């Protein structure tokens, strides 16, 4: 199949590219925002999306999932198919991106699945109700929008989660402010936070939970993984290993700091 580059009618910053049976969405070429395998549209092709599904290790049966940033809808489609009892709401600022939902085989709205056009930060500030999982994957042609990475935004994310709720944030690893954003999330969630590198190294996925004990220990994670792997073949074992590895590093760092003091 020949390559196809198709800018949307209203903006030159949103670009579709089709090649080798894959359809990709770009906000700032050549950076890929989303990628879909046309013969298997619900498959999570990009590794950062598979890492983000690690929220299942912390919240295996979410009743309500809210996602900020739709993109090509990879996570939205996967959650709708594999978590049919969960309500899923995606909030996307760009109507041009939403207009591409048919190209990316994003299902129509229904009782448990909705795509809303609006500002994600404003949506959470309003009467949005509480969620069990918040997925933050909002980017534009400039990168991370300021409204989706401020201290006030992360504080509001904490407030909008049920007890035990999980925040998952996709960050660009090469963003000079990445460490600052992680610090803001740690502050909002009282240090109940761990950062896992996506396999390609281009993304850092932050998991934070509104709970007293975090993260789960080895035995608990192993048991959850055993139950989840029969349904979710999305490298949850790698994400679990990343969580445990980063938590060990954090604890060692604390011990070293105390010893120096």
Predicted regions, residues:
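SAM/dcSAM-binding transferase cores
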Residues: 2-20, 24, 32-39, 46-47, ...
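The AdoMet/dcAdoMet-binding core of the Class I SAM-like
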Residues: 5-8, 19, 23, 43-159, ...
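A short, flexible beta-alpha/helix-coil linker loop
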Residues: 30-34, 139-142, 167
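Short histidine-centered beta-strand/loop micro-motifs
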Residues: 34-37, 125-126, 197
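A generic structural signal for alpha->beta connector loops
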Residues: 85-87, 110-112, 164, 190-192, ...
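C-terminal substrate-binding/active-site "lid" region of AdoMet-derived donor-dependent transferases
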Residues: 145, 151-215
């Amino acid at each position: 199949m020949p390559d196809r580059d198709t800018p949307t009618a209203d903006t030159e910053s949103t670009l579709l590219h089709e090649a080798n049976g894959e359809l990709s969405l770009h906000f700032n070429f050549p950076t890929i925002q989303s990628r879909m395998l046309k013969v298997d549209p619900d498959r999570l092709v990009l590794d950062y999306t598979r890492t983000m599904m690690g929220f299942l290790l912390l919240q295996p049966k979410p009743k309500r999932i809210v996602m900020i940033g739709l993109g090509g809808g990879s996570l939205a489609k996967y959650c709708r198919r594999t978590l049919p009892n969960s309500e899923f709401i995606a909030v996307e600022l760009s109507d041009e991106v939403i207009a591409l939902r048919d190209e990316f085989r994003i299902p129509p709205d229904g009782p448990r699945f909705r795509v809303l056009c609006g500002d994600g930060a404003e949506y959470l500030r309003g009467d949005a109700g509480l969620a069990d999982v918040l997925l933050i994957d909002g980017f534009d042609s400039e990168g991370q929008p300021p409204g989706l990475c401020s201290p006030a935004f992360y504080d509001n994310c904490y407030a909008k989660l049920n007890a035990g709720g999980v925040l998952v944030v996709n960050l660009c690893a090469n963003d000079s402010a990445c460490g600052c954003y992680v610090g803001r999330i740690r502050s909002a969630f009282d240090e109940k936070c761990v950062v896992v590198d996506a396999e390609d190294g281009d993304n850092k996925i932050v998991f934070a939970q509104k709970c007293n004990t975090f993260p789960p220990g080895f035995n608990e994670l192993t048991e959850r993984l055993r139950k989840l792997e029969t349904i979710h073949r999305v490298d949850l074992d790698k994400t679990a290993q990343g969580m445990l590895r980063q938590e060990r590093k954090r604890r060692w760092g604390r011990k070293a700091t105390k010893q120096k003091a």
